[in-house]
């Protein structure tokens, strides 16, 4: 176990579990280098080449969607707007990577016949179904990833060999927070604290080196109070920023202007805060001992039930995702969790005091990443394939290989 660089630490990922040398390389030199195929609960892979499902009579349509370089959430918002549907009439089993080629099922209420043509999006097959696709119907995702421009192939091979037997920390990965603008969790903290000014400052006054010149100019204008000019500069893809600016120009107060951001996006911010806190908890737990060996005070999951560990009990170690209704660890682990919450100025009750649609309850997440069907090949490029359960991040594995100082420069 070695210390991670400052960028990772800012997201709560304080350590690498491997002590091998950095391989370098780029993970998304082209979208085809990062392939994600959804895996249903019964093991069916929603393959890029096609899938056969048994239709059921009902009020939903399941659609096999293959997309490239396309944001999942923005695709759903566009479909809802184009088809005249409400957000609850479209559902997915999980959000997929944007800079990638991804294959998944989406479901739309009703009989869908005329879907719009969308660049880089293919609708391959349609099935009538009696219920929507939801996260509970998804096992996870199968990944096939090519790492190019590897600087030290021997370092990559050493890390990949180590990953076959080591207990990997189940961190929330970079894309949960952003790599160009790693602020999703900070916006989430401002939301749960109901601090509109802090939210505004993070969204518009915090500017990062790898942002486009257009985005930088727009943020500078907004930060100086020139909302109309900022709105003119921001391209349409900046949905959140434009929503806040339009609200302010309509005369809304700052909080209500922020609340005009689509609820799905606001919820992502709140969940990013939960993810950041979990990463901090997990990093602290790594300091206290091996993740695959429960210690006094740990929470463990046994047959779907979460209990406090007792000697001889067994079970897999879990940590809480902060919110209402979850048990907290005891002993040294519990003390560390409480100290971290105090340092971050967050209380579990804050998550329940949010406006309707943003209230999130707590839960539990395994501390060890479950890695299945792991294979790799090392040549000029490095190719890796594996299957992960829903909610786990491929970039957590790849960061161990690349060990990037600046993740964005390496395609993360």
Swiss-Prot record:
GO terms for molecular function: RNA binding; tRNA pseudouridine(13) synthase activity. It catalyses: uridine(13) in tRNA = pseudouridine(13) in tRNA. InterPro entries: PsdUridine_synth_cat_dom_sf, PsdUridine_synth_TruD, PsdUridine_synth_TruD_CS, PsdUridine_synth_TruD_insert, TruD_catalytic. It comes from the Archaea. Residues 167-370 form the TRUD domain. The active site is at 97 (nucleophile). GO terms for biological process: tRNA pseudouridine synthesis. SUPFAM superfamilies: Pseudouridine synthase (SSF55120). Keywords: Isomerase, tRNA processing. The keyword Isomerase applies. The keyword Zinc does not apply. Its EC number is 5.4.99.27. NCBIfam families: tRNA_TruD_broad. Belongs to the pseudouridine synthase TruD family. Could be responsible for synthesis of pseudouridine from uracil-13 in transfer RNAs. This is Probable tRNA pseudouridine synthase D. The lineage of its organism: Archaea, Thermoproteota, Thermoprotei, Thermoproteales, Thermoproteaceae. The gene is truD.
């Amino acid at each position: 176990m070695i210390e991670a660089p400052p960028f990772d630490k800012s997201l709560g990922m304080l350590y690498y579990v491997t002590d091998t040398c950095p391989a370098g390389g780029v993970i998304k030199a082209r979208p085809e280098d990062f392939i994600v195929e959804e895996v249903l609960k019964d093991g069916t892979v929603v393959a890029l080449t096609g899938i056969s499902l048994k239709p059921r009579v009902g009020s939903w349509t399941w659609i096999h969607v293959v997309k490239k370089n396309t944001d999942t959430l923005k695709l759903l918002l566009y479909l809802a707007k184009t088809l005249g549907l409400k957000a609850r009439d479209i559902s997915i089993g999980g959000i997929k990577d944007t800079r990638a080629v991804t294959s998944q099922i989406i479901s739309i209420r009703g009989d869908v016949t005329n879907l719009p043509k969308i660049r880089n999006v293919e609708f391959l097959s349609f099935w009538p179904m009696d219920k929507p696709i939801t996260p509970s119907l998804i096992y996870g995702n199968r990944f096939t990833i090519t790492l190019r421009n590897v600087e030290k192939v021997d370092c990559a091979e050493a890390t990949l060999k180590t990953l076959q037997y080591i207990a990997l920390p189940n961190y929330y990965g970079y894309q949960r927070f952003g790599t160009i603008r790693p602020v999703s969790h900070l916006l989430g903290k401002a939301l749960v604290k109901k601090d509109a000014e802090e939210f505004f400052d993070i969204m518009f006054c915090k500017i990062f080196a790898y942002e486009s010149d257009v985005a930088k100019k727009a943020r500078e204008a907004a930060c100086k109070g020139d909302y109309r000019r900022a709105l003119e500069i921001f391209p349409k893809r900046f949905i959140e920023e434009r929503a806040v600016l339009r609200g302010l120009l309509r005369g809304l107060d700052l909080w209500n202007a922020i609340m005009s951001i689509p609820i799905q996006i606001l919820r992502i911010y709140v969940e990013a805060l939960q993810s950041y806190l979990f990463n901090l908890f997990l990093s602290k737990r790594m300091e206290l001992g091996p993740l695959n060996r429960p210690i006094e005070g740990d929470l463990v999951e046994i047959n779907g039930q979460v209990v406090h560990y007792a000697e001889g009990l067994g079970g897999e170690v879990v940590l809480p995702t902060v919110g209402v209704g979850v048990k907290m660890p005891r002993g040294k682990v519990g003390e560390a969790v409480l100290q971290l919450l105090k340092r971050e100025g967050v209380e579990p009750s804050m998550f329940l005091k949010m406006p309707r649609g943003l209230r999130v309850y707590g839960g539990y997440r395994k501390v060890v990443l479950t890695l299945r069907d792991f294979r790799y090949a090392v040549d000029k490029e490095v190719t890796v394939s594996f299957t992960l359960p829903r909610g786990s991040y491929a970039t957590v594995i790849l960061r161990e290989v690349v060990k990037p100082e600046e993740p964005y420069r390496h395609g993360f």
